[in-house]
Structures are given as C-alpha cells and as structure tokens.
C-alpha cells in the first residue's frame, strides 16, 4: 500500500475530523480520482505525435491512456468530428495514491521557477485542477527520448463539499500551495 494512503488513514482523517467537527469518519473528504489529460492539437497533421503523447502518458501513469476524439467539427482549428486530438487517463485506488505521492514529492518540486501552486484553482466543489507545462518533470520520462515538450492537465477529484474542505485535505498532504 502507498505510504500516502496510510498517512491519510492514520493522520489526515483525525486532523480533518477535529478541524471541521465531523460526526462520522465517512464525512471526511478523500481523494476519489486523479485525471491526467494531454491535448495534442498537432495530431491533426501528424498521427505519430499522438502515439508519442500516449506513450509519455503511459510512462507517467502506468496505465494505458484513452484516446479522446473531437466532439464536433471546428473549421477554424481544421478538425472534424471524431478526429483523435488527445489522450487521458483516470487513476483510482493504488495507482492513484502512488501517482499522487510522486506528484507531490518528486514532480512538482522539479518545475522550473517553482514558487508554489495557486490555491485558487479549485472549482467550487473541492476539486483541484492544475496544468503542467512540460512532461519532463516526471522522472519516468527520459529527457533524451522526448520528441517534443508537451504539457498536461491534472485534476484531483475529491469528495469534499466545498473549496475550503478540499484545500484543507490537500494541505494536510503538504501540497505545495503558494503562500
């Protein structure tokens, strides 16, 4: 079992129960899933770019990504409905906790000019979204084999009812918020 999951059960639950005066352990917010999304708009011209992006996402997450397709045609972007334009992975359970631990301890500190993550990126329901400009911050990606630097979106979905509860949950994991 991931260390962070044990830490959540042993420390975070008790801390949040006293902070928010919950009656039951089941009321305490928890991390439900982590979604990684990589939009590859250039895949319209070159299909190989999408394969490389999917390989990067597989290395980062340890799970095969789902190829996302355009929902509707947009002439300005030169895409048609059904064109493959990106890939995404939804992590749950053990893989989610392992990725979350790597994200906090290894990947985020490797971001260039890092001063902390914005605490305003919550969606109103306790879920946190962040963008990463380059995939090379993850140790699984070999810098020499990268054909193109791509960014990705990371969404941490929690069972929190409000942004305040979600922020407290992530802060309990020492999430590096900007002061």
From Swiss-Prot:
GO terms for cellular component: cytosolic large ribosomal subunit. One of its GO terms (molecular function) is RNA binding. It comes from the Bacteria. Keywords: Ribonucleoprotein, Ribosomal protein, RNA-binding, rRNA-binding, tRNA-binding. The keyword Ribosomal protein applies. It holds the Pfam family Ribosomal_L5. InterPro entries: Ribosomal_uL5, Ribosomal_uL5_bac-type, Ribosomal_uL5_C, Ribosomal_uL5_CS, Ribosomal_uL5_dom_sf, Ribosomal_uL5_N. GO terms for biological process: translation. This is one of the proteins that bind and probably mediate the attachment of the 5S RNA into the large ribosomal subunit, where it forms part of the central protuberance. In the 70S ribosome it contacts protein S13 of the 30S subunit (bridge B1b), connecting the 2 subunits; this bridge is implicated in subunit movement. Contacts the P site tRNA; the 5S rRNA and some of its associated proteins might help stabilize positioning of ribosome-bound tRNAs. Belongs to the universal ribosomal protein uL5 family. HAMAP family: Ribosomal_uL5_B (MF_01333_B). Part of the 50S ribosomal subunit; part of the 5S rRNA/L5/L18/L25 subcomplex. Contacts the 5S rRNA and the P site tRNA. Forms a bridge to the 30S subunit in the 70S ribosome. This is Large ribosomal subunit protein uL5. The gene is rplE.
């Amino acid at each position: 079992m991931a260390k962070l999951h044990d830490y959540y059960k042993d420390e975070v639950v008790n801390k949040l129960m006293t902070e928010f005066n919950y009656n039951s352990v089941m009321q305490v917010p928890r991390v439900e899933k982590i979604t990684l999304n990589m939009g590859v708009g250039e895949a319209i011209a070159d299909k190989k770019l999408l394969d490389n992006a999917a390989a990067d996402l597989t290395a980062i997450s340890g799970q095969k990504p789902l190829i996302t397709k355009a929902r509707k045609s947009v002439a300005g972007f030169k895409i048609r409905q059904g064109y493959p334009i990106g890939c995404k992975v939804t992590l749950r359970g053990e893989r989610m906790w392992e990725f979350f631990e790597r994200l906090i301890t290894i990947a985020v500190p490797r971001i260039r000019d890092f001063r902390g993550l914005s605490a305003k990126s919550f969606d109103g329901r306790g879920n946190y979204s962040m963008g990463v400009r380059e995939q090379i911050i993850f140790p699984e990606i070999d810098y020499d084999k990268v054909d193109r630097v791509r960014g990705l979106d990371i969404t941490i979905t929690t069972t929190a009812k409000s942004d305040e509860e979600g922020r407290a949950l992530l802060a309990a994991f020492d999430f590096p918020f900007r002061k």
